[in-house]
């Protein structure tokens, strides 16, 4: 195995500031596992990092946290994971292990948490390091491409299973037909909920895909009256739950009066600004439970991998482009054009 590798690194804060650099291949010591990366999905957070939209980012750092690969080396304190195992990994690289959240394995809430691809070098490289506790073995029939979607799917499982307990009887709105919205849709249909998927005119191709993936109703909110659609479907009561994957304040405020009294609003997408103006009148008067859903934790991953392995998620429809690691910039540009669903980077295309 070579002692050096290539990686896509955010070198400094600000717009772009990206470079394709040489790095030393990390060593798997203690409880760490070294993974030869097969695929990495480009996440919306990677694009925000590229654009310099996060304050005080850790730099330099190799990006990438949605990945799959094969174990090539294990540390001395790794009893279960073996060289040759096909794996994916949670994004948690370090937690304090002492706070109340860590004691409940709610690692996404640990105030000292460090994540792969954000504070610790990530998977947009030939190799990535992970801790054994974060590793999940892949079923034999689950492809590396599909497994690289485990992380964003786990985030959606967290929102639907843990934070809001979506049920068969529920009628819901999912706002934003990007990758996260489409993952939420497919989970909801697996559960059996009635789904109204919303977007705007430029999302036409994504709304069409949403219909193909099982959305009961699709609504272009620039052309159709969402309130009228919801009131007709729910006899005026409103939907049971709204999941926002858009991070668009106008969309959020348009949906709040359409939630059934004592219903739920689940914020999955991130807003561009820390402070936003919300329709608090609807939240109060309708007794809406407004819920934040942050990332994922260990409890979400087995469900996500099971959904992928059983075919509940349409892997082929979700992955619309693949690029070798050397063409990472073209891959980022393609994502930023806004016409793709999920773009994958192949770190070792000659081997997987």
Swiss-Prot record:
Gene3D superfamilies, per database record: Medium-chain alcohol dehydrogenases, catalytic domain (3.90.180.10), NAD(P)-binding Rossmann-like Domain (3.40.50.720)
Source organism superkingdom: Bacteria
Binding positions (Mn(2+) 1): 43, 65, 151
Pfam families registered for this protein in UniProt: ADH_N, ADH_zinc_N
MF terms in GO: metal ion binding; NADH dehydrogenase activity; NADPH dehydrogenase activity; zinc ion binding
Broad EC category: oxidoreductase
Cysteines paired by S-S bonds: none
Cofactor annotation comment: Binds 2 manganese ions per subunit.
Entry keyword annotation includes Oxidoreductase: yes
pH dependence: Optimum pH is 6.8-7.3 in the reductive reaction and pH 8.3-8.6 in the oxidative reaction.
Gene Ontology biological process: arabitol catabolic process
Keywords, ordered alphabetically: Manganese, Metal-binding, NAD, NADP, Oxidoreductase, Zinc
Sites where the protein binds Mn(2+) 2: 96, 99, 102, 110
Catalytic activity: D-arabinitol 1-phosphate + NAD(+) = D-xylulose 5-phosphate + NADH + H(+)
UniProt-listed Enzyme Commission number(s): 1.1.1.301
Cofactors required: Mn(2+)
Keyword NAD recorded: yes
Regulation: Inhibited by EDTA, 4-hydroxymercuribenzoic acid (PHMB), mercury and zinc ions at a concentration of 2 mM.
Subunit text: Homotetramer.
Family: Belongs to the zinc-containing alcohol dehydrogenase family.
Protein name (database record): D-arabitol-phosphate dehydrogenase
Taxonomic lineage of the native organism: Bacteria, Bacillati, Bacillota, Bacilli, Lactobacillales
């Amino acid at each position: 195995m070579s002692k050096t590798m290539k990686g896509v690194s955010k070198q400094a804060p600000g717009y772009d500031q990206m470079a394709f650099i040489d790095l030393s291949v990390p060593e798997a010591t203690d409880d760490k596992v070294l993974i030869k990366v097969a695929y990495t999905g480009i996440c919306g957070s990677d694009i925000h990092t590229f654009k310099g939209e996060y304050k005080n980012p850790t730099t330099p750092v190799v990006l990438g946290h949605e990945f799959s690969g094969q174990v090539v080396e294990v540390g001395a304190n790794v009893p279960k994971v073996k060289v040759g195992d096909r794996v994916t990994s949670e994004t948690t690289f370090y937690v304090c292990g002492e706070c109340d959240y860590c004691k409940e394995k709610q690692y996404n809430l640990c105030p000292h948490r460090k994540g792969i691809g954000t504070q610790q070098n990530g998977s947009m490289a030939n190799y990535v390091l992970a801790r054994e506790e974060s590793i999940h073995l892949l079923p034999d029939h689950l492809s590396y491409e599909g497994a690289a979607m485990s992380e964003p799917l786990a985030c959606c499982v967290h929102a639907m299973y843990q934070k809001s307990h979506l049920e068969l009887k529920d009628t819901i709105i999912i706002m934003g037909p990007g990758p996260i919205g489409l993952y939420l849709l497919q989970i909801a249909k697996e559960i059996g909920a009635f789904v109204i998927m919303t977007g705007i005119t430029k999302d036409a191709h994504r709304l069409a895909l949403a219909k193909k993936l099982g959305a009961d109703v699709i609504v272009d909110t620039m052309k159709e009256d969402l309130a009228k659609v919801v009131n007709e479907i729910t006899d005026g009561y409103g939907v049971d739950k709204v999941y926002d994957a858009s991070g668009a304040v106008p969309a959020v405020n348009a949906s709040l009066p359409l939630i059934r009294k004592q219903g739920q609003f689940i914020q999955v997408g991130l807003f561009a600004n820390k402070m936003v103006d919300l329709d608090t009148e609807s939240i109060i008067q309708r007794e809406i439970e407004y819920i934040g859903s942050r990332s994922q934790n260990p409890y979400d991953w087995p469900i996500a991998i099971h959904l992928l392995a059983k075919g509940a998620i349409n892997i082929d429809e979700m992955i619309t482009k693949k690029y070798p690691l050397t063409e990472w910039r073209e891959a980022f540009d393609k994502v930023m054009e806004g016409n793709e669903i999920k773009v994958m980077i192949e770190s070792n295309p000659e081997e997987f």
